[in-house]
Amino acid sequence: MAQYLAPHELDPYAKGKVKDGKLTAPMFDVVFIQALSTEPIDAKSIPTWKKYLKSEVAEVKAAGSEPVVVVTWAKKDHPEDTKKLADSIISAANENGAAALPVGLAFAEAHAGRPDINFYAPDKRHPSAAGSYLYGAVAYSFLFHRSPEGLKFLGGCDKPLSEADAAYLQSVAWKTVRAFYGW
């Protein structure tokens, strides 16, 4: 993680809080940690991923923040990986005393209910505007422990989502987070 924080040493908001690429004082309430794509289920990558996840979670905690591990989504042409990714990431988050953010589970739920919405960029692994919106709605639900339903923001991309699509994604995000955490 240190390699990612090093450039922030020059940012005004980080003055005195980042040194040698490491957090030295509480700077954020929550820090999201996200693996690369299918790293948590790739046999060759799992040991390295777990090693660095452990150190990143420890570093975030040491800096006074809450680590949250993002449950990533399956690639568009491999929906069967959703459960494998969720199981691997949730298990690793639990092992390290971190919370998990069920974004991938929300992707699967949203796609099942509305296959007409494209959740993926052309590379079939990164999120589209709708996928990014859903991610944000899941994060909102988790962070504020309340529903994003009724929020008027339709996305900041070139073409905003329709009100109906945004309402659907808000609903799925809240339903997923509530079910995941038993709220």
Regions found by a protein language model. Give the residues of each.
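Active-site segments of SGNH/GDSL-like serine hydrolases
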Residues: 60-87, 103-114
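Conserved catalytic region of serine esterases and O-acyltransferases that act on ester linkages
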Residues: 126, 137-183
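Conserved SGNH/GDSL esterase-like catalytic core that processes O-acyl groups on lipids
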Residues: 1-49
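Second-shell loop/turn segments in exported
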Residues: 37-46, 72-79, 118-127
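Acidic (Asp/Glu)-rich catalytic clusters
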Residues: 19-26, 55-63
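Extracellular serine-dependent O-acyl
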Residues: 87-118, 137-149
